[in-house]
């Protein structure tokens, strides 16, 4: 520190620090209670309750921050506390965290509160946690009644089948399994199919995280197999095959499959973690290369993920020299998008003004982004990180980008010494725009992209999402080849839309008209009219009609809306339906097995 306090003499400093930690502890207690409730809701098959719980948990953090800020302002006149006391507040807070089990998350909470009270000129390590102060290495909950982060199992003692069954039954799920012996046999067959015969080394063991990961209609067992110097990841989704009866749906044994279920395009898991850093460290061992920021976000600690991401950005800026540039591709009417080529993300800013035909406001667009944050993204909508007062070094901004910023978003800019402060922006994973992917791709790429696009829109439809603007430029292709939607300014709930057929033309003049001859309400959608915008390229048209000819039939859209209006929640799988045991090993299921994965079995990733 520049002016390190020699004595922690301020009682107010201690009281403020203690109050802030009390509100963080309240937040984390609610966070853990949500994961415990998720287990109960999963056991009951209360899918609507699980959706509601996930939505409520997302807003809980900001509610606790708001409550804490109000208390500090009312009881301690926080805005007028002097600099030396603020430094003491941070030091007292560090002292209170020395034996805390979520210190990194508590530091982030401290930052969130301070950023509501202090001017951004105080956003330095003197006053907030620009860098972490408390180490999380080897952190564990050592209370006698506490669950360990993970449990170790040794198949060499009792055999693999017995060990796998013990792993499943140790989670003590209330509903019975349809046939756990059958399912364990499927797991062993899948392991054999993937790895073949292998010799068991003396250290052969299985590590399993002690809490289940809940999302959608699944509960995931997550762990790793260790044999000699190999570390093999796995995840086993548990699902209801019918009300009150469970089954192991598959086992995912490849790192890329785990990276997909933990990806930025899926909703956050509900998982009970006494020591979140220990869970994240474990997940890093089975998904090396995946940023910790993304892992924290995927397990529901999105504010911690956001904090780590910003630290990653600052670190990258200090170790790179390229410039931020306008993102390649077709410019949007609503958002200004730029990127740093050496950093795999895009930065999106809502423009000050929108040209016709756009009729919207900044507040409406921000609400659309919140809608996506709260909604089940199913692996088909990109998550966004929302930031305020982001300071970027002017020397790293391309001149063309600066001119574009000054033209399109002058109200959001503030020059501060050698930095440009952007008052509000969103950050997303960078993807290849689907229109460029189709334009530049091989025939095989076009087939893959078009098939994925149709699947993505149909899955969003079943999840009650109408994308609005469905042009290819509003979708991206991830590094795993998945098509993901990322332009949200026209997004609507499908249940709020009026699906219509185009009325027949009344005469030849109507037929030749370039304008609709029928009235169009603000929520009317006409699937029959999408063809001219999507099928202009002959290669695309051929593949589209091969895989998704029903896309332009209003009956498809209306059927999804009707099911949603009846309260039906379709099944979605963040892995190929062909991996499901009932599909992969049908002989093991016989007449009692599930169907072949058609119908509601949708691939959501």
UniProtKB/Swiss-Prot annotation:
Annotated GO MF terms: [isocitrate dehydrogenase (NADP+)] kinase activity; AMP binding; ATP binding; phosphoprotein phosphatase activity; protein serine/threonine kinase activity
Binding residue positions for ATP: 327-333, 348
UniProt KW keywords: ATP-binding, Cytoplasm, Glyoxylate bypass, Hydrolase, Kinase, Nucleotide-binding, Protein phosphatase, Serine/threonine-protein kinase, Transferase, Tricarboxylic acid cycle
Annotated GO CC locations: cytoplasm
GO BP, sorted A to Z: glucose metabolic process; glyoxylate cycle; tricarboxylic acid cycle
Domain of life, per lineage: Bacteria
Function noted in UniProt: Bifunctional enzyme which can phosphorylate or dephosphorylate isocitrate dehydrogenase (IDH) on a specific serine residue. This is a regulatory mechanism which enables bacteria to bypass the Krebs cycle via the glyoxylate shunt in response to the source of carbon. When bacteria are grown on glucose, IDH is fully active and unphosphorylated, but when grown on acetate or ethanol, the activity of IDH declines drastically concomitant with its phosphorylation.
Family: Belongs to the AceK family.
Name of this protein: Isocitrate dehydrogenase kinase/phosphatase
